[in-house]
Amino acid sequence: MSFLDRIAECNAHDPAAYRPLISAGHTIGAVRHRLAQRLRDFPNVFTVSADAVHLLDIFKDADQRSQAVERVVRVLEADGIVRGRRNEAYPVLVNWGDAPLFRIERAAAPHFGIRSYGVHMTGYVRTPDGPQIWVARRAKNKPTYPGMLDNTVAGGQPVGIGLHANMVKECWEEAGIPLELARNAICVGAITYRMDGEDGLKPDVQFCFDLELPADFTPRNTDGEVDEFFLWDWRKTAEVVAETREFKFNCNLVLIDFFIRHGLIDPDRADYLDIVAGLRR
């Protein structure tokens, strides 16, 4: 196995399994054909054809669209199609920085192929032998990817909060990192992928942050979502990423990006440019 295997797993996607979801003239998602057939039961919200699913144009603003889609999501929840409500609203954007076309419950986003955004932070300790990386293990009772390894801090990007403020909030909740340290987190870029998941399409963007931590600081979880933290040499971290599937799928890409930016992957290796290109699809 290799870094390219992890990248390929995050980009396993069959476009033929979906039809586009269109709102206000923009393609903003993709719906599996089976769900598209179910959406025919909501003619006051969607128009469904063999080629696409359209959110009706009678909804004139983000609030109206959000309310209409939420009514459908509630029915899909009752049917057991959408599961694990998070009570967290994700923005539905045409482009990053735009005003949202509407908002959607986080758990429903992949069912509609909505691009989700998140923040992932690699916390590291500088040493003469290269960085040591704080690795989290997700709580065994988490509804998604329980017990898997994770980045030091990570979370979804909901409506109503900026990226850096969200990262600072997540730093405290997930790792007990106080404000005076967390505010030093630097956004260093983003990784993207397009992946077929159990619930639908995940065409997501994760903003990557780095945070150098003092040697005497130990993360501690405060919200029950992390069972433990490990401080690993970067070489061990890279080996686990390349040779196993112990990390949650997108965390692998965040760490590979970290290895590249910190000069830890040899640029003379034959697959170097494929790795670099694969992080942003």
Which residues does each predicted region cover?
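Catalytic-pocket segment enriched in acidic/His residues
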Residues: 173
